[in-house]
Curated annotation (Swiss-Prot):
Chain sites annotated for binding Mg(2+): 17, 44
Biological process per Gene Ontology, one example term: 'de novo' AMP biosynthetic process
Species annotation: Mycoplasma mycoides subsp. mycoides SC (strain CCUG 32753 / NCTC 10114 / PG1)
Gene this chain is encoded by: purA
InterPro entries per the UniProt record, alphabetical: Adenylosuccin_syn_GTP-bd, Adenylosuccin_syn_Lys_AS, Adenylosuccinate_synth_dom1, Adenylosuccinate_synth_dom2, Adenylosuccinate_synth_dom3, Adenylosuccinate_synthetase, P-loop_NTPase
Protein name per the record: Adenylosuccinate synthetase
Binding residues annotated for IMP, in chain numbering: 17-20, 42-45, 132, 146, 226, 241, 305
Catalytic activity from the UniProt record: IMP + L-aspartate + GTP = N(6)-(1,2-dicarboxyethyl)-AMP + GDP + phosphate + 2 H(+)
GO MF annotations, alphabetized: adenylosuccinate synthase activity; GTP binding; magnesium ion binding
Residues binding substrate, per UniProt: 301-307
């Protein structure tokens, strides 16, 4: 596996859960650095190798390679309690976290953020977003409103007063808007200081560090969270996450300039899934959805919620490619379709009787869209042991080629199982 450039951004091209962690782990075997640039511990990544499965939520997926420096960038939001627990859990599995570093500019998730997240979701009644209730949205809201507290604020001699003022403000919302009991300051302060002491020696200026490494010709992987269709600006609003998930945010969420980004790889599942509310044009409403869900183990890593299942939506994928800046694609969970004799791909939408090939902005419009399908022959045989594109059944090869023809972007590779070894490059190297 050759690498002809200094940096690669890996993003999800659907509604998350595409297998970004597995592909990041695969490429991290040749990387010097892996950076998480957005999201929080709401994004669970599952990595499998040597017959063991490992889950990470906020720590970059490169942590399983001891030679890789792993950086949690300034664009993330960090729950220190979750981070410390994740570090301890990895250490208990004999995985070193000495190579994990945290940006001093990252914003912090506190107990009040998670509580407000929960109370807001309950207040929405039938219009729920489907949030994980981990405080991600309220933390990003505080960041924009300039109420946020960053990791570097721990060094301020007035940190205790800053924290108290912040909690007092949020307790007003908790008690007067939601009629809930206030949170206790001493508990939050003591816990925060304990967790800060645990990670303080691993706090860095992520932008300074990553920029220097790129200038030294080190290979840097940028690991995205969620997917482009959950992007706060370009996703299916309001049923989105609270951060920017596209490659455009990799530089902002790390602290470098966008000219230091070379390539963008979009991870695309062989079918569509979605957690929570919001339109999903190609959703399967038959028993087939349950069958594919079980074959693909399509349940949330953090919440256990069953994911909604749909045929691959190429209208949405073309949109994600455009706004996500995607140069190449990587197909995952390809083997889940092994048992299907007929496979559909959504090539267009029908909106109010008109055929369209563009992705509507509003959930109201998307819910009125009907899928226009093209049906392909399946391969109906096990592909989990193939080691090259040429070993795939002809119809599986045709599936990949047909997607490429429609979206006009090539596949770099595909995955036929959960193990690291079941990851196959089509061309054997990264394209220039």
């Amino acid at each position: 596996m050759k690498n002809n450039y200094k940096s690669l951004v890996i993003v999800g091209s659907q509604w998350g859960d595409e297998g970004k962690g597995k592909i990041t782990d695969y490429f991290s075997q040749k990387a010097d650095v892996v950076v998480r640039f957005a999201g929080g511990d709401n994004a669970g990544h599952m990595i499998e190798f040597n017959n063991k499965r490992h889950k990470v939520t906020i720590i970059p997926s490169g942590v399983f390679n001891p030679k890789v420096k792993n950086i949690i960038g300034n664009g993330t939001v960090i729950n220190l309690k979750s981070l410390v627990n994740e570090i301890k859990r990895l250490n208990e599995s004999n995985i070193s976290t000495d190579n994990v570093f945290v940006s001093d500019r990252a914003h912090l998730i506190f107990d009040w953020h998670a509580l407000i997240d929960q109370l807001q979701e309950e207040n929405r009644k039938e219009n729920k977003i489907g949030t994980t209730k981990r405080g991600i949205g309220p933390t990003y809201a505080d960041k924009a409103a300039r109420y946020g507290i960053r990791i570097c604020d721990f060094q301020n001699p007035n940190f205790k007063e800053i924290l108290k003022e912040n909690l007092d403000y949020h307790n007003q919302i908790i008690t007067k808007v939601y009629n809930h009991e206030p949170l206790d300051f001493d508990v939050i302060y003591n816990e925060s200081m304990t967790n800060y002491q645990f990670i303080k020696n691993n706090i860095i200026d992520s932008g300074y560090e990553v920029s220097n490494l790129i200038n030294e010709n080190k290979f840097v992987l940028f690991e995205g969270a969620q997917g482009v269709l959950l992007d706060i600006d370009h996703g299916t609003y309001p049923f989105v996450t609270s951060s920017n998930c596209s490659a455009n945010n990799a530089s902002i969420g790390t602290g470098i300039h966008n000219k230091q980004i070379n390539k963008v790889l979009g991870i695309v599942k062989a079918y569509n899934t979605r957690v929570g509310s919001g339109a999903m044009v190609s959703e399967i409403k038959t028993e087939l959805a349950h069958k594919l869900r079980e074959r693909g183990r399509e349940y949330g890593l953090n919440t256990g919620r069953p994911r909604r299942i749909g045929w691959l939506d190429l209208v949405a994928l073309k949109y994600a490619i455009r706004v996500g800046g995607i140069d190449q694609l990587f197909l995952t969970l390809f083997d889940v379709l092994d048992t299907e004799t007929k496979i559909k791909i959504c090539t267009h939408y029908k909106l109010d009787g008109k055929i369209i090939d563009w992705f509507p902005a509003s959930d109201y419009e998307l819910k009125r869209c009907e899928p226009v399908y093209e049906e392909l022959d399946g391969w109906n045989q096990d592909i989990t042991k193939v080691t090259s594109f040429e070993e795939l059944p002809i119809n599986a090869q045709k599936y990949i080629k047909r997607i490429e023809e429609i979206v006009k972007v090539p596949f770099l590779g595909f995955s036929v199982g959960s193990d690291r070894k079941q990851t196959i490059l089509i061309k054997g190297e990264f394209d220039d």
